[in-house]
Amino acid sequence: MSIKKLFAETFLAWMNGETASQSDIVISSRVRLARNLSDIAFPHLLNQESGQKFMQLIYEAWQKSEFKELKQMELVTFENLSALDRKILVEKHLISPNHAQSTAFYQGLLVKPDGSLAVMINEEDHLRIQCFLPGLQLEEAYRRAQEIDDALEKELDFAFDDRRGYLTSCPTNIGTGMRASLMLHLPAITISGQSGHIFQNLNQLGLTVRGIYGEGTEAIGNFFQLSNQITLGQSEEDINASLTTISQQVIEQERMLRKSLREQMKYQLEDRIGRAYGILTHARLISSNEALTLLSDVRLGVDMGMIPRISPNALNELVVDIRPAHLQKKAGSDMDAVSRDAKRAEVIREKLQTGEEGS
């Protein structure tokens, strides 16, 4: 996949849920490593001169590296990127909303065209190295992110303190600089009214539950990001092991509640899922929030064998494909709200039809 296809097409490596572990509940795993250069001011303090110097150092490190996966990545500079394309990168989860909206000097993205590896340049930190994989694969995501980290550190001098670890713009990231997160689909926990209690317990265990695009975003379509809070005093391996163990408990609770809903609310659940499928396959206008809510019900119905089998890849693609920037990119022109809702309904009808296995 070329970098042009990254913007023109939706499917990315993390969307491949066909064979990934626990992929009916764990949509994706992400590991992010925050790094800063030792002799360059933090991003919010950069001026034009230091920003230019910083970008030159990053460019040279990328060009000099002989590590295969780093050489396969391509550099996208934001000064040459439209606001629409920045939003597309946010909708693909490759950059944060803050990164897209920032006006700081010299920002960009090093990205592997399949989206499995990405390095945000000059977001909150100089570098945020990320690996995205489908299903529950935190160890593998960390391994691949660490390889990029090691390759860059051969060429760059990272800010590191022997006592505190890696130094970051935000004190909560000091230490490993690592944020491990899972994108979870938890409809049964939400429907049963257990989310408040469960999420409070997760917070007490040192984990954070956020919305679909991370910090400061709302949970839509029963998608939640579960991530570690603590980066100091724990090793990367310990952080991953803890998050994996606790997430397994959340997964088990979700499975038990799905079974309970089926046993105790069979007809109500069938009606809810059937109505969602009917609306999505026939609607001519649909908003983003309504679509994500109904797609959550359809995904639940597929996972529980209550409606025709639809490829998990098709459902994962739809979550991104129906977002405003992707719809506008497909249309090739500006769209008002009604036009977007009409295009969204069309995209969903087509995808659900073509995504049905055996059709």
UniProtKB/Swiss-Prot annotation:
Biological function: Catalyzes the specific phosphorylation of arginine residues in proteins.
Annotated protein name in UniProt: Protein-arginine kinase
Taxonomic source organism: Syntrophomonas wolfei subsp. wolfei (strain DSM 2245B / Goettingen)
Transmembrane segments: none
Classification via Pfam families: ATP-gua_Ptrans (PF00217)
GO MF, one annotated term: creatine kinase activity
Gene Ontology terms: biological process: phosphocreatine biosynthetic process
Activity regulation statement: Appears to be allosterically activated by the binding of pArg-containing polypeptides to the pArg-binding pocket localized in the C-terminal domain of McsB.
